């Protein structure tokens, strides 16, 4: 029987012995214990440091039982918040004080003086702010060195072809964000570019003045400054000719003013998309006369009122927008006159609007054409706006008529 030699021959390759982290730590402890060259001063200078004790509170006990998803998410968020406060080194009492301070709860039991509680809260806030500051600091790996971009390029050129990749991995550079100078004109480059484009378009519209327009669309834009007046005149073709042909003139400026739910002016809106005019023959086919409007029970006492330059629109559909009003009334915009103002009401006055024309003659023409038009399924009812004097006279007249009626009833009885 042959004997098997288990010895490794000298010419065979010996595998490299791998050392684990645990073995390395044990070896360093053994060397530290067997080292006799240390002095008493070195031993006394070393201080014992222990890791602080932590509290483990299982999350399963609080989450046990039946609960909804929102309740579980709320409970989980509270648990994470408590864990983050424990990481700051706060004890249970300080955590309870901070939570009651954040939630605004006031306990009726005996507590410490307000000054002591305020000092504790201030200390907790300082810890939280310090932790946030540390987390915001730029982080880097251990045994690494930060270089500038130029220094990094030099290192790469020097070690090109050398076997020092591990050393290069320890070097890094970080691009710092460029700080913008407030006085730098390059910061306003985008806004300047937009202004130049708009100026070029204005010049193109001015060149087209007096020529037949290629498109039947309406381009409505608001150029209202802080004073509420338009900066540029409107560009309109003759409204009578093109409206009769069913073509929409091209409007350049039209004020579109919206009101917030508190009925306060929030500034002008800009309509820059093409808007087509509603042809006049279509308006005439889909509108009611004043007699037909009075047959509706809601508007049985309909009266347009005394003519003036403000039109009051009511019974508007919720789907009506400024674009719809512009497509109906912008045909009355004069070529060199002031722009027509559109005011849409919201909140309690939703479904109503005011349109201001340059004069009452144009307003009367607009009312005569558009009144009773069926817009988005509802009849558009238009009246002339009433000023404060007309309102007071109307209220006085109604009070007198009511008093006369009551007197007649008493005398008749």
Swiss-Prot record:
Positions of region (Disordered): 223-247
InterPro entries: Nucleotide-bd_a/b_plait_sf (IPR012677), RBD_domain_sf (IPR035979), RBM41/RNPC3 (IPR045164), RRM_dom (IPR000504)
Disulfide cysteine pairs (residue numbers): none
Keyword Phosphoprotein: yes
Keywords: Phosphoprotein, RNA-binding
Domain of life assignment: Eukaryota
Keyword Iron-sulfur: no
Cleavable signal peptide: none
Modification sites for Phosphoserine: 232
GO biological process: mRNA splicing, via spliceosome
One term under GO cellular component: U12-type spliceosomal complex
Molecular function, one GO term: U12 snRNA binding
Ranges of residues in domain RRM: 309-387
Ranges of biased composition (kind: Polar residues): 223-235
Function: May bind RNA.
Protein name as annotated: RNA-binding protein 41
């Amino acid at each position: 029987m042959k004997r098997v030699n288990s010895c490794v021959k000298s010419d065979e390759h010996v595998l490299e012995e791998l050392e684990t982290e645990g073995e390395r730590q044990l070896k360093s402890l053994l060397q530290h214990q067997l080292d006799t060259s240390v002095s008493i001063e070195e031993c006394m200078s070393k201080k014992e440091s222990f890791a602080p004790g932590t509290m483990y509170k299982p999350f399963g006990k609080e989450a046990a039982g039946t609960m909804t998803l929102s309740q579980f998410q709320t409970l989980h968020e509270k648990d994470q918040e408590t864990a983050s406060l424990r990481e700051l080194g706060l004890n249970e009492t300080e955590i309870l004080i901070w939570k009651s301070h954040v939630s605004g709860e006031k306990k009726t039991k005996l507590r410490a003086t307000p000054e002591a509680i305020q000092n504790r809260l201030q200390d907790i806030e300082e810890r939280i702010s310090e932790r946030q500051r540390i987390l915001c600091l730029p982080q880097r790996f251990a045994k690494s060195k930060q270089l500038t971009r130029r220094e990094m390029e030099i290192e790469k050129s020097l070690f090109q072809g050398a076997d020092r990749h591990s050393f290069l991995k320890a070097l890094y550079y970080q691009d710092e964000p460029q700080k913008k100078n407030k006085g730098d004109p390059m910061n306003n480059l985008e806004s300047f570019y937009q202004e130049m484009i708009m100026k070029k378009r204005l010049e193109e519209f001015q060149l087209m003045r007096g020529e037949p327009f290629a498109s039947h669309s309406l381009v409505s834009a608001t150029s209202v400054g802080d004073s509420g007046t338009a900066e540029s005149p409107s560009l309109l073709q003759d409204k009578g000719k093109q409206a009769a042909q069913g073509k929409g003139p091209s409007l350049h400026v039209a004020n579109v003013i919206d009101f917030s739910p508190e009925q306060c002016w929030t500034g002008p809106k800009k309509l820059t998309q093409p808007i087509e005019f509603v042809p006049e023959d279509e308006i005439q086919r889909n509108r009611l006369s004043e007699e037909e409007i009075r047959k509706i029970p809601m508007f049985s006492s309909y009266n347009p009122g005394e003519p003036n330059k403000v039109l009051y629109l009511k019974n508007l559909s919720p789907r009506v927008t400024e674009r719809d009003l512009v497509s109906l009334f912008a045909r009355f915009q004069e070529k060199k006159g002031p722009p027509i103002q559109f005011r849409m009401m919201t909140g309690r006055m939703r479904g109503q609007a005011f349109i201001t024309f340059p004069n009452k003659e144009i307003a009367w023409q607009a009312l005569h054409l558009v009144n009773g038009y069926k817009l988005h399924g509802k009849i558009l009812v238009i009246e002339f706006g009433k000023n404060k004097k007309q309102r007071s006279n109307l209220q006085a007249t109604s009070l007198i008529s009511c008093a006369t009626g009551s007197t007649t009833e008493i005398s008749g009885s």
